[in-house]
Structures are given as structure tokens and as C-alpha cells.
């Protein structure tokens, strides 16, 4: 279930700033046709930080209702009580797993991190993937904390976006006796992470090129690194373009250009600049995504 390419879904909005239910369903169908192994609603790319609690639940409900692949729902928060509430709802909705970001802004000490994740894991019987992304949280989860949490039965993995391949290797080295997976949280480092034992990626680019991202990951997992490298270099310029500004600003514009459901960004995020829009469009044309 936690192997392969899984898009961190964008959340499309209608013109009156509501969840675009039909658009989200179309986007899910598109990535499924591209061969993705699962979908991840309500993550950073899904603008979860600016969704209301009811909208958060609505997006997860839509994903579960229409998806033909496993759903791993983002249920994290910097408020343990809120994260627990989101996780309980997701489990009741029938998700296959949840993704829990390390609490942001608060910068908890190691004891706080351990208690946060353990409390949620003990309260809700659902497979949980932790999410380490220091650029968003202001804190890199300590290796010792990750290794300790890997021993918890239903904490089954971590999405790693620290940018530190050495740390990824250490996590894998120190959890080799656990049933624990490491999933890339950075498109540009997915292939290196797979090469040291990672099992997949929760991907921004897979919203736009799900077929290529899926083929790259599947090739690497099968040991065909020649094919994987070829695809990696093919899509690398697009990946760079998708991070010219804060995620998900560029990918929502890319989705719009590609004819997918997108809609406005929620403030305080503002639209992609004209210069960067042209750069994104250029990379989409090179890949044949648009004419």
C-alpha cells in the first residue's frame, strides 16, 4: 500500500471558493489512469492549512468515495487534539492510511514529538505515515525520535522531505528490523531515495505527469535504474519549474494549463507570476502535456 508513486493531490475550488467536487473526481480519475499507486488528499499541496475542518472532511470523503486506489489522507496539525479529530474522521471514512506532519510552529521537544504521535496511534487503529519536512515545520525530526516511533505497531513509515539523503539512509539502517517504509517527499530526490531503499514518493509532479512518475518509480523498484534515470532526467526540468514559487502555486497553474480542475489559490497564497507561468508552460510543452 505504501509503495509506488502517489500524488499529493491539489484541491480544486469553484469560482465561489468552494470545494470543486466534480473537479476533484476528474483529477483523481486522471492520475489513476496514469497508473499511480495511491492518492494523498489534504496535504501541503492540497492547501490543507487553509481548509476549514468541514472542508478537510469533505475532501477526504470525496477521495474515498471515488478512488479506485488506496487513499492516504493528510490528517496532521500542530494541535494534537485537532490531528486526532482529523485522523478519527479519516479512519471512519474508510481511508487506507493517514499522513501526519510533524507539528509545525510549536517546535516541540523530543518528548513532545513522541507523545504527539503515540497518542494518535494509540487512539486510532489506522496505518500512519509520519511526515518530516523541516522547511515547513521549522524543525527536523531527530533520528532517535523517528527510530523510536517506528517501533509503534501502526506507525508504518515516514515521508522524508528533509533533503538529507544521509539521514534517509540512517533511518532505513536503523529500522531494518521493523516493518517500516521511507517514502520520498521531494520529487527531485525521489530516485536517490529509492536507490538507498525508499519505497515510493508522495509527489507534486504526479498531479501533472502521473504516468511518467509512476513508470520512474516502478522501474527503480524493479531494479531497472537505467530506465528510471532516463525518466528522472526527462521530468527534472518540470519538477524544478513546479517549485519556482511556493508549492502549490506552480502546480495549480500547471493543472489549469493542462486542462485539469484547479481554481483559485486560497489566500495568503497568490497566483503564479507571469514570468514563471511562461516557464511552467514551456516545460509542459516540452513533455507534450500541452501544445
UniProtKB/Swiss-Prot annotation:
Iron in keyword set: no
Annotated transmembrane regions: none
Amino-acid biosynthesis recorded as keyword: yes
Catalytic site positions: 131 (proton donor/acceptor), 159 (schiff-base intermediate with substrate)
Subcellular location(s) per record: Cytoplasm
Residue numbers binding pyruvate: 45, 202
InterPro entries, A to Z: Aldolase_TIM (IPR013785), DapA (IPR005263), DapA-like (IPR002220), Schiff_base-form_aldolases_AS (IPR020625), Schiff_base-form_aldolases_CS (IPR020624)
Gene Ontology annotations for the cellular component aspect, listed alphabetically: cytoplasm
A biological process from GO: diaminopimelate biosynthetic process
Keywords tagged on the record: Amino-acid biosynthesis, Cytoplasm, Diaminopimelate biosynthesis, Lyase, Lysine biosynthesis, Schiff base
EC number: 4.3.3.7
GO molecular function ontology, one term from the record: 2-dehydro-3-deoxy-phosphogluconate aldolase activity
Top-level class of the enzyme under EC nomenclature: lyase
Pathway recorded for this protein: Amino-acid biosynthesis; L-lysine biosynthesis via DAP pathway; (S)-tetrahydrodipicolinate from L-aspartate: step 3/4
Domain of life: Archaea
Subunit structure: Homotetramer; dimer of dimers.
Role summary: Catalyzes the condensation of (S)-aspartate-beta-semialdehyde [(S)-ASA] and pyruvate to 4-hydroxy-tetrahydrodipicolinate (HTPA).
Matches recorded under HAMAP family: DapA (MF_00418)
Family: Belongs to the DapA family.
Name of the protein described by the UniProt record: 4-hydroxy-tetrahydrodipicolinate synthase
Organism: Methanosarcina barkeri (strain Fusaro / DSM 804)
Encoding gene per record: dapA
Amino acid at each position: 500500500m505504501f509503495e509506488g508513486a502517489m500524488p499529493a493531490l491539489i484541491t480544486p475550488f469553484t469560482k465561489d471558493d468552494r470545494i470543486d467536487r466534480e473537479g476533484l473526481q476528474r483529477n483523481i480519475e486522471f492520475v489513476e489512469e496514469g497508473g499511480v499507486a495511491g492518492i494523498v488528499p489534504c496535504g501541503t499541496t492540497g492547501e490543507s492549512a487553509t481548509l476549514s475542518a468541514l472542508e478537510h472532511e469533505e475532501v477526504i470523503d470525496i477521495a474515498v468515495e471515488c478512488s479506485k486506489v488506496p487513499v492516504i489522507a493528510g490528517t496532521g496539525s500542530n494541535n494534537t487534539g485537532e490531528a486526532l479529530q482529523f485522523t478519527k474522521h479519516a479512519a471512519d471514512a474508510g481511508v487506507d492510511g493517514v499522513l501526519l506532519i510533524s507539528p509545525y510552529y510549536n517546535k516541540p521537544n523530543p518528548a513532545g514529538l513522541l507523545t504527539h504521535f503515540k497518542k494518535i496511534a494509540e487512539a486510532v487503529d489506522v496505518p500512519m505515515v509520519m511526515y518530516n519536512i523541516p522547511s515547513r515545520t521549522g524543525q527536523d525530526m531527530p533520528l532517535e525520535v523517528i527510530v523510536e516511533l517506528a517501533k509503534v505497531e501502526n506507525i508504518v513509515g515516514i515521508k522524508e522531505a528533509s533533503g538529507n539523503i544521509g539521514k534517509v539512509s540512517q533511518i532505513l539502517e536503523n529500522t531494518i528490523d521493523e516493518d517500516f517504509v521511507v517514502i520520498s517527499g521531494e520529487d527531485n530526490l525521489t530516485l536517490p531515495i529509492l536507490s538507498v531503499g525508499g519505497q515510493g514518493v508522495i509527489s507534486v509532479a504526479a498531479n501533472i505527469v502521473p504516468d511518467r512518475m509512476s513508470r520512474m518509480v516502478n522501474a527503480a523498484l524493479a531494479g531497472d535504474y537505467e530506465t528510471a534515470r532516463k525518466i528522472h532526467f526527462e521530468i527534472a526540468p518540470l519538477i524544478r519549474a513546479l517549485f519556482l514559487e511556493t508549492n502549490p502555486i506552480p502546480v495549480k497553474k500547471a493543472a489549469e494549463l493542462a486542462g485539469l480542475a484547479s481554481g483559485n489559490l486560497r489566500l495568503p497564497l497568490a497566483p503564479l507570476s507571469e514570468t514563471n507561468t511562461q516557464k511552467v508552460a514551456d516545460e509542459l510543452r516540452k513533455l507534450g502535456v500541452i501544445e
